[in-house]
Amino acid sequence: MANTGVIIVSTFPSEELASRVAHLVVSAKLCACVNFTKIRSIYSWHGKVEDQHEFIVLFKTTSKSAKKLKAEIVRLHPYEVPEIVELKMSDVSKPYLSWLTEESMYRIAKNRHNAAK
């Protein structure tokens, strides 16, 4: 299976938490890049219409790293039911996909490989 680019979309309740999660997953090389901005969300929750400010977060990674990234987002997320949506990238430039792949090779795999030398 070819390694392709994906975007994992989630929302967080604060800029501080979005930033902290972004730094953790980029440092762990679970994704190459994270973008986030403030949004207004209107949604139904337990029979009530909610109207809240949140931060939408776009995690850019590869199909091979997506499963581990999503598990880490779930682990770090404060919501009972976090939004975690995987979108496939299309028409991605070769240089961008190469960069994305190189920067999304999570450290655990690299450390195991280096430890075997």
Where are these regions (language model features)?
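Positively charged, small/polar-rich N-terminal and surface patches that mediate targeting and assembly
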Residues: 1-117
